[in-house]
From Swiss-Prot:
Organism: Homo sapiens
UniProt-annotated stretches for the region Disordered: 1-46
Keyword Membrane applies: yes
Dityrosine (Tyr-Tyr) (interchain with Y-357), cross-linked positions: Y372
Keywords, sorted A to Z: Antiport, Cytoplasmic vesicle, Endosome, Ion transport, Lysosome, Membrane, Metal-binding, Synapse, Synaptosome, Transmembrane, Transmembrane helix, Transport, Zinc, Zinc transport
Designated gene of the protein: SLC30A3
Catalysed transformations (reactions): Zn(2+)(in) + 2 H(+)(out) = Zn(2+)(out) + 2 H(+)(in)
Protein name per its UniProtKB record: Probable proton-coupled zinc antiporter SLC30A3
Length: 388
């Protein structure tokens, strides 16, 4: 094929015999009309981001931490520094005051420091790319970090509950009311500061299913999807639990300061507010278990997704519909679509994928298109799962 003159200065091509060119193998070459002739490309070239997304919803994210995760990391760094400083102060104050409640609060802060350090590590780990072994990447390291945070709080609280029970049985202890009151006041201020730092306020323009706060929907549920970083949420729940206990310790310290004979308020406040701290972990624990058990993402119902797929022209039935979440912000769907023999599979696939992405904010969708068979209505494996 060789260029020949054409109107307007453009080039056209025509077939040429190998004898005319003396080329080997009779291969055909096509020179671009828009670029200067260049050397042939190597046989193996690196893959690049395409200007159009033939099967992907979003452009390829840049390497490293996303803006949402960078924001989460900054939150955790700041909260961890504040937590460590005030933890050291509470250890000293609790020792001087001989207060188990203060030491309890310091132990909770120690658990917070450890959990936030673990969360920072899990955030870094979650940025590692997918491999042939870890095909989904390391997204769930955030969820595992949140689970470790909850478990650590439960363990520390259990130990302190035991110590509070022992103090109630044996009253051979003395409380320094003044030191306890001062330390408890500082602890309340510290926990308020950490709660402010960890408040789930993401960076601007966090759109899409990977946003830090809400995923806007083009259609579908009226309420936005509440999202967030699980590591920051777990740390925030820790701080809320500590804040509740700090208020209880402050109330007990005021009572002991003015009425030293009521020193039993120290272990009693430890007992009561430790239980409150355990209860505060319930929302995070529920989300973690839902993710690890491959449950349907929050605010994404099975029936709405199924009805959306069935509303696509040409789709007769759907089965093998699975919805799950890698994290609170990364939702995945897969399904088989049984279509009419007259339907265009490519058109059905494009329309179904578009509706799932736009209405429910899925990060990844895998759909298999197949011809509808009447036997599917009686097939056991093609039936919908029962209600939970």
């Amino acid at each position: 094929m060789e260029p020949s003159p054409a109107a307007g200065g453009l080039e056209t091509t025509r077939l040429v015999s190998p004898r005319d060119r003396g080329g080997a193998g009779g291969s055909l070459r096509l020179k671009s009309l828009f670029t200067e002739p260049s050397e042939p490309l190597p046989e193996e070239s690196k893959p690049v981001e395409m200007p159009f997304h033939h099967c992907h919803r979003d452009p390829l994210p840049p390497p490293g931490l996303t803006p949402e995760r960078l924001h989460a990391r900054r939150q955790l760094y700041a909260a961890c520094a504040v937590c460590f400083v005030f933890m050291a102060g509470e250890v000293v104050g609790g020792y001087l005051a001989h207060s188990l409640a203060i030491m309890t609060d310091a132990a909770h802060l120690l658990a917070d420091v450890g959990s936030m350090m673990g969360s920072l590590f899990s955030l870094w780990l979650s940025t590692r790319p997918a491999t042939r072994t870890m095909t989904f990447g390391w997204h769930r390291s955030e969820t595992l970090g949140a689970l470790a945070s909850v478990v650590s709080l439960w363990m520390v609280t259990g130990i302190l509950l035991y110590l509070a029970f022992v103090r109630l049985l044996h009253s051979d202890y003395h409380i320094e009311g003044g030191a306890m009151l001062l330390t408890a006041s500082i602890a309340v201020c510290a926990n308020l500061l950490m709660a402010f730092v960890l408040h789930q306020a993401g960076p601007p323009h966090s759109h899409g299913s990977r946003g830090a706060e809400y995923a806007p929907l083009e259609e579908g549920p009226e309420e936005p999807l509440p999202l967030g970083n699980t590591s920051v949420r777990a740390a925030f729940v820790h701080v809320l639990g500590d804040l509740l206990q700090s208020f209880g310790v402050l109330a007990a310290s005021i009572l002991i300061y003015f009425k030293p004979q009521y020193k039993a308020a120290d272990p009693i406040s430890t007992f009561l507010f430790s239980i409150c701290a355990l209860g505060s972990t319930a929302p995070t624990l529920r989300d973690v278990l839902r993710i690890l058990m491959e449950g349907t993402p929050r605010n994404v119902g099975f029936e709405p997704v199924r009805d959306t797929l069935l509303s696509v022209p040409g789709v007769r039935a759907t089965h093998e519909l699975h919805l799950w979440a890698l994290t609170l912000t990364y939702h995945v769907a897969s399904a088989h679509l049984a279509i009419d023999s007259t339907a265009d599979p490519e058109a059905v696939l494009a329309e179904a994928s578009s509706r799932l992405y736009s209405r429910f904010g899925f990060s990844s969708c895998t759909l298999q298109v197949e011809q509808y068979q009447p036997e599917m209505a009686q097939c056991l494996r093609c039936q919908e799962p029962p209600q939970a």
